[in-house]
Amino acid sequence: MMMNSTIRQGWQQVLKRFSIPASGDRLIISNPTDQPIGLFGAFDTSLQTLSQVGDDPEVLKQKIHIPTHLDIASALEASPRSFPWIFLTNSFCTFGGSIHAQNLQAFATAEFKSGFCYMNLLVPLSFDIIDAHADSFRVFVEQLPDMLGAYPSLSMVLNVMLHAATRFPEIVSSPVPTIAFDAESLQFHVTDKRGVPGMWNILKAGRVYELLSLAADGVGCEYMLYPVGAAPQYSFWKKSMDHFTSDRFVEFLAMQNLLASALEQDYTTHDALDALLAALQNAGYTNVVARERRFPNGHDPSTVWLNLSEAPISEKLTDLKRYLLVGHRSDDTADITHNVHQYVFEVLKTMSVQFSKRTNAYNRARFEVNHKVIWNAEYGRGPQQNAELEALVLFLNRQSLEIENILHRTTSPVVVTNWQPDVPTAAPEVSEGEPTHAVATPMTEAPAHATPVEVVNLPSTRSYWAETLVGVLTAVLGTIFALLTRALIRAKRLRRKPTFPWVTLDSGDEDDDHSGGGGGGPQTPGGQPPASPAHRTHQSRLSVQDIASDTSLLSVDLDEDTLSQYDETFQRIRRALFETSFTDILQNSARWISALEAMALADGNAPYTLLAQYLNGIEEAYTSFRNTGHVSRATLSSFFALEDSLRAAGIAFGATTPTQTIQNQFADSPARRWKTRFEQIACELGDASIKSLADLADIIDTERERSDLTQFDVLAASSISSLCRAVRIISDTTDPDAQLALVENATAMQNNINAILGTNVSIPFLSATRRLLVTRRIQQAGAENRSGATPETIQQLADAELIVSEANMFNEMATSQRDIANATQEATIREHVLSPVNALANVGMAAAFFRSGGMRSRALHPAMPTMPGVSAATGRPIFQAFRGRGHRLNR
């Protein structure tokens, strides 16, 4: 069947915009962040099979290399009989499947960009579109990439296929390309003539209706949200690394043997000089490694290669080649052999880590780790790389000893007249003129059997003098920093700084008299009040810093009645905390917090602020728990820390603190038990599920009479009980219309429960009943409207409409779950991030209180009224309210 010319013109426009350009990389699949995740041709057993004819099983196994350099536009504008179609098989029969393969046509000279591979689904469908639908299908094809964009979810792609099957019924039985799935990146790929990426799995759907059936079965599954989007290559390859393609690499042992053999020769003749020069010029290969060619491609990774184009060995080789070419002409014949050996010695020394402390030796691991490149066809090569790196270090150390033995063994060269190097001896034509630059090395491509090695990380060479210098500088800078810090701390101690009202630092003669001698000792509340600024001598000066740090300016004088009211309020707060009376806390928290803030302003005492923050937080946490049934561990931890600080300040708690009460109520919450049982019942099937739901409703009705239920418990009980009864009513109803309405209502109740409880429960009985009722209704109403279609098409379209209904329900559930996720994320940020920060701030305030004199003040006032029936703790200073200078209760 030929493609309609109108549809062909639409594909021409799409390919011009969304196909891989001629200069693009056609051998790799990328994810939305442009990171490579898949490749083609890496493993032959996973390649997609191709077919150019019918169903010949032998031809199905052939792999055909299609040229990709053809111009897409000219190919599409050519005669219809010369279109560049290739026939693929969309089945998995080659890999053990049982479904019969059907050949389908795809582009032979074009591949879609990463992220737009879903367009391959429409290529074989284009051949089955009838002429009456050609214009509509062309518009559909041209608009689809702009509507979906790159990397749409599988759910979006399947919805598009469902829409296409509804508009163009003739494609319901059409074949579709193989869809591959990568378990590593969680991404799908619709294959083209490049086949299945290496190590990817295959989705078992060969036709449109099979694909739509898969969509129906996958409603609510996580993989429906995965994106739909490859030859191996190096990731993170940089432009600065392109020089490696022209660098000359040689096997380390081959170069070592060549140089060792060169040390045994006599160079009094030109033939020996020319032979060594030719051997050095032809040693190794270029084009050993590139972005798309692994180092060293196809070799044993244990083989070590030497880069002759990197310094310092390139410099030593250049000197040796220059001497062999023209440098020897100015020397006596008797000295040439000795001089050649000296140059060879220098080259050997650069190969030894014992002499040079730096090496140009690589294996696969060192190349990839040192240059931070990753071969995208492999995963988890870390342990292998470490082993190869260790092997490289051992190899270089062993060869360094061997090179040292060679140097000692060949101090007296042996004359061997018939010596020939192992490499080709043909020397290049060399001009007799004096060269003006380094001797050039001919470019020799790496043969097919000599493919490069693999990666290892060799530690960079160490300079012990540099390390010693860095250590000394670090010690000096650390000492200077410590001295400066100590000086700043001492200066800060001598400055006037904020203190609590019962501790002041004053200066001057009169201050000394008031403090009982000793300049600037701490003033206790029982002593003389500090002298006013008017009585200070002219020697006592105030600066802007003094004014800013004088906390007495913030103190407030209160009358006796107000102080008495505050004292009574404080005692009520202590009693409520001791008795863990949430009723009093909820009723009076606003008034108590206001009074505590006024106390803190009058007294300047940190425990008042801590207590106000604790009351405010514990009220919010308890209210939130009763309304939502949830409290985070971070919130409880912050309150436990505050309670410890308040205990240290003298606030007594009963046997159970408010935080422990909330924790115990959360652990014993009836709603949590009902939620757990409800989730367990959701996994049951058939009549057992209906009976279990009825039993759960009876249990809830029994426990609803309890008086200690929270608002959340009441809400959960009402919702779950109503749904359980609704399911029972549905099972007893026989009228299909009434039953469908009840199912819709019960489904809405189920979604509401998921939103309230934060669950993702789906009762199988409701889904099965709803599917059965919708199927019956569609079958009854659909046959009359499709009189011209075959029974198979009618059945397939009925299934498609059922999928639409399922997809709509899935979208509603997804929207509900998305709202739950957003609310949960906000609650998590509030409870797990902000609450710990507040807790740390509260602990910091407590620490500031004790560090600034709170303990000294309490030591001067050990007596404090205790709670009824509780004896005061001995041996520990007790916090007492209203001792500051501002309220003047120091009598």
From Swiss-Prot:
Pfam families (alphabetical): Peptidase_C6, TMV_coat
GO-annotated biological processes: proteolysis
Gene3D superfamilies: Helper component proteinase (3.90.70.150), Tobacco mosaic virus-like, coat protein (1.20.120.70)
Gene Ontology terms, MF aspect: cysteine-type endopeptidase activity; structural molecule activity
Record's catalysed reaction(s): Hydrolyzes a Gly-|-Gly bond at its own C-terminus, commonly in the sequence -Tyr-Xaa-Val-Gly-|-Gly, in the processing of the potyviral polyprotein
InterPro entries xref list: HC-pro, HC_PRO_CPD_dom, HC_PRO_CPD_sf, TMV-like_coat, TMV-like_coat_sf
Keyword Protease attached: yes
Every Peptidase C6 domain range: 109-229
Residue ranges, annotated region (Disordered): 502-540
Positions bearing the site annotation: Cleavage: 229-230
Enzyme active site: 117, 189
Keyword S-adenosyl-L-methionine: no
Stored PROSITE patterns: HC_PRO_CPD (PS51744)
EC number: 3.4.22.45
Source taxon at top rank: Viruses
UniProt keyword annotations, A-Z: Hydrolase, Protease, Thiol protease
The record's account of how the chain is modified after translation: The viral RNA2 of bymoviruses is expressed as a single polyprotein which undergoes post-translational proteolytic processing resulting in the production of at least two individual proteins. The HC-pro cleaves its C-terminus autocatalytically (Potential).
Family per similarity comment: Belongs to the bymoviruses polyprotein 2 family.
Name under which the protein is recorded: Genome polyprotein 2
Originating species: Barley mild mosaic virus (strain Na1) (BaMMV)
Taxonomic lineage of the native organism: Viruses, Riboviria, Orthornavirae, Pisuviricota, Stelpaviricetes
Gene that produces this protein: RNA2
